[in-house]
Structure formats: C-alpha cells, structure tokens
C-alpha cells in the first residue's frame, strides 16, 4: 500500500524491476535498534532502504522495509544478524537477477526460512513505500 495516498500497489508496480548488475549498491541495510530483554532474548530491528538510482528506475519516492526479529540465541548480536541478513538477501537477489519490490520481499522470506525458528523469529514486517505521482 502506498503510505502517502493509501492506495494499494498494483501488480505492475510491484513487479517492475531492473537487472541486479545495472545498479551499483541498489539497496542498503541498517541496524535500527537492538534491545535485550530480561530473559536474555533480543529484539533486533533491521531496515532495508532502496538506493536513489533504484528508486528512480522503479518509480518510487521512498521505499523502506523494516523487519523486527526476536532472537532466542544469546550469542547472536545485532551486527552479526545484519551481516548474515545482508549476505543472504543480496545473494538471493543476485541469483534472481532482477530487483523489484516483490523480489526483495521474497528474499527476506527466503532468509527467514533458511534459519531455524529456534534461533530467531520474525514477528513483524512493516514498510513505508511511496510511489512517485508525477
């Protein structure tokens, strides 16, 4: 859904993409927040942002995808999870060959499916996508 207008994204808007090799550093990853709970579990918030060149090709004004991860492992830090997450998402996008909104979401789901649910659990995924209106 477009967070500015409230309209649902169309199929063509979600499937529009560009080749992975055409854009240098198409997406970048940020560690938003790491919170340690009293039980030893960690809540880690990761953010994926589209680069300016990718946003221009896809016709986006803003594209932020946020993933909240609940880690049961006391050894898994936010930086370690961010490195693994970045590696696997970029590897999956490289294997697909095309970057689109749907392919990025598929890559995130692929990463979540790769790891055992006992290590971490992703309870929420939210986004901020705004299409260019002009």
Curated annotation (Swiss-Prot):
Keywords: Host-virus interaction
Family label: Belongs to the geminiviridae replication enhancer protein family.
Pfam families linked: Gemini_AL3
GO biological process: viral process
Name of the featured protein: Replication enhancer protein
Disulfide bonds: none
InterPro entries referenced in this protein's UniProt entry, alphabetically: Gemini_AL3
Assembly mode: Homooligomer. Interacts with the replication-associated protein (REP). Interacts with host proliferating cell nuclear antigen (PCNA). Interacts with host retinoblastoma-related protein 1 (RBR1), and may thereby deregulate the host cell cycle. Oligomerization and interaction with PCNA are necessary for optimal replication enhancement.
UniProt function note: Increases viral DNA accumulation. Enhances infectivity and symptom expression.
